[in-house]
């Protein structure tokens, strides 16, 4: 069973808040409030202090690999080495990854990061300035990742954007023009990408810079989040 099949963590927020204070010294004497953020296979919580300082706690799916989570932390740290990118990625606040038992007694990895306060790209009114900001940061990100490689990035992963052929088995879920568009995309991928894959340059990528993983404020991109799909 993979993280895509396993039920996300089931958390009692009050009990988890107590656990946070017991295990992280920077929360021990703080009055904190927790609220849920959007997430698919994990649980993400926003932590607010009375001082208005905010954090994100990521409680990973019980089936998530600890090695893969450590890889994500290394990836974020590498991106933050670039002075032009440092503020675009959350700062990792935990010294090591701890584990919390959820309500079903499953062992779930816990990580603490700074919170990037803004709106999701999907819910923002974006302008040419926003698009230019996005293009510039994606280019800087790609350049920075050229000097980063770990074994964990080289993996078999269903959502690998360099091989979309697996989507063909779902094509009959669509009809008409939508089906034709998808079929043409798969055919062009087969012809121009997959047949030439060995001749194309490779590098570690974010893997999923979709419009719910990009943070915007005042028509400017201020953050990239969620590196769970990163791949070489």
Cite the ranges covered by each PLM segment.
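Conserved short submotifs of the Hanks-type protein kinase catalytic core
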Residues: 106-119
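ATP-binding glycine-rich phosphate-binding loop
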Residues: 26-48
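A conserved alpha-helical element in kinase catalytic cores
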Residues: 59-106, 124, 128-132
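A cross-family kinase active-site recognition segment
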Residues: 123-180, 202
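Short glycine/proline-enriched loop/turn "hinge" motifs that connect secondary-structure elements
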Residues: 37, 49, 100-108
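Short Pro/Gly-enriched beta-strand edge/turn motifs at strand-loop
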Residues: 22-31, 187-198
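Active-site acidic catalytic loop and adjacent metal/ATP-binding pocket
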Residues: 40-50, 56, 90, 190-232
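Juxta-kinase regulatory segment immediately upstream of eukaryotic protein kinase catalytic domains
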Residues: 1-31
């Amino acid at each position: 069973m993979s993280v895509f099949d396993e039920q996300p963590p089931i958390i009692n927020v009050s009990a988890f808040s107590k656990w946070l204070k017991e295990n992280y010294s920077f929360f021990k004497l703080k009055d904190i409030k927790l609220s849920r953020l959007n997430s698919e296979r994990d649980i993400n919580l926003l932590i607010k202090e009375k001082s208005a300082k905010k954090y994100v706690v990521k409680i990973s799916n019980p089936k998530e690999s600890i090695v893969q989570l450590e890889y994500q932390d290394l990836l974020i740290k590498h991106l933050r080495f670039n002075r032009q990118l440092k503020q675009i990625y959350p700062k990792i606040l935990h010294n090591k990854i701890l584990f919390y038992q959820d309500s079903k007694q499953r062992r779930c990895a816990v990580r603490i990061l700074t919170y990037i306060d803004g709106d999701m790209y999907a819910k923002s009114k974006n302008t040419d300035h926003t698009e230019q900001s996005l293009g510039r940061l994606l280019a800087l990100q790609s350049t920075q990742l050229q000097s980063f490689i770990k074994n964990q990035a080289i993996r078999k992963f269903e959502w690998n954007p360099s091989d979309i052929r697996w989507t063909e088995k779902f094509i009959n879920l669509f009809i008409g023009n939508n089906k034709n568009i998808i079929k043409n995309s798969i055919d062009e991928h087969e012809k121009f990408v997959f047949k030439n894959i060995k001749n194309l340059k490779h590098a570690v990528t974010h893997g999923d810079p979709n419009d719910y993983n990009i943070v915007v404020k005042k028509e400017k991109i201020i953050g990239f989040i969620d590196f769970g799909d990163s791949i070489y």
